[in-house]
């Protein structure tokens, strides 16, 4: 989880290794309380919003027609979407780690 990073920073991090299925989760810049799952695929970055309901469950906006699923934790959500054909552009393959403080300041 990358916390509060800009969309641009997110895109830079995902584009660095250029691997289809690279992903990260960050806070949404324009929807308070929402998170964004960002995935690199075929030279583009796809963003899916993650919302938390009043009971604390996570749900993600996927492709139209895909049933809504609830997840107890972000880890459960990621585990599910690591499998192919779950409603995202591609399955989650390579988590992009948070840069260390020394790397961010360069």
Where are the regions that the model predicts?
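Domain-scale recognition of modular recruitment/scaffold domains used in eukaryotic signaling
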Residues: 1-106
């Amino acid at each position: 989880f990358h916390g509060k990073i800009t969309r641009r920073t997110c895109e830079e991090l995902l584009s660095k290794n250029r691997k289809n299925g690279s992903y990260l989760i960050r806070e949404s810049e324009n929807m308070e309380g929402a998170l964004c799952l960002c995935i690199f695929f075929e030279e583009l970055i796809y963003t899916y919003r993650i919302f938390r309901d009043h009971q604390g469950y996570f749900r993600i906006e996927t492709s139209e027609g895909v049933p809504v699923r609830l997840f107890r934790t972000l880890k459960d959500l990621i585990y599910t979407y690591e499998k192919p054909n779950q409603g995202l552009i591609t399955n989650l393959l390579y988590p992009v780690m948070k840069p260390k403080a020394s790397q961010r300041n360069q």
